[in-house]
Amino acid sequence: MKIITWNCNLNFSKKFENLEAFDSDIIIIQECERLKTDFFPNHNFFWTGRIENKGLGVMISKSTKARISDLHNQKLINFLPIETEGLNILGVWAYNHRAAKFGNDVSGNTSDALSFYKNWLAESEVSIFGGDFNNSVVWDKGEKENNFLSIKSSLKNLDFRSIYHHKTKEDYGSEKEPTFFHTKKENKSYHIDYLFLKGMEAKNIDIGLYSDWIELSDHMPLVCEI
């Protein structure tokens, strides 16, 4: 099984061909437009968002039955729970404080999504929690619930682990491979995209190279093979 998460920086339908060679089973896409479920020949496409051309998509191989969970809470901006046979997936594009522009009764915080979907994630022996968290320990201030260390701790309590950090043994905040380049500048790099897995062992995880992907997006894809 192959899993990808990638913030495509808009116009995903025109960029998908760049992912096709990976032959992935599960693809979590941030900043993508709303498309029909059967838009892609080999994957079903599920979407959530408040802006038609800029939401969160999850693609599942058509060989696997999948659906959006009945628990889907649209007041949690850009978090999408997908149920497949024997596997739960929570796609993430954390809007954080920016979600406030959609009203006072919504949240874009990963901490709130974790709290809401906690039992759903706990009930499944095999799960994926991944995407663009827009978060890193380098930005943590004080002891806020939505600090990345707090999020990581909550995920650890649910038996999730970041595959990148498990494989590389690198400390959070000291990652050698960035996933995001602010304003597409190579010297403004951060690691803010993650794949947390539960009940699965990964063979490897790769992050796209700046030179290969920067023309397409300010984020690099994470590709994990199970």
Model-derived features: positions:
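Active-site metal-binding loops of divalent metal-dependent hydrolases
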Residues: 8, 32, 94, 133, ...
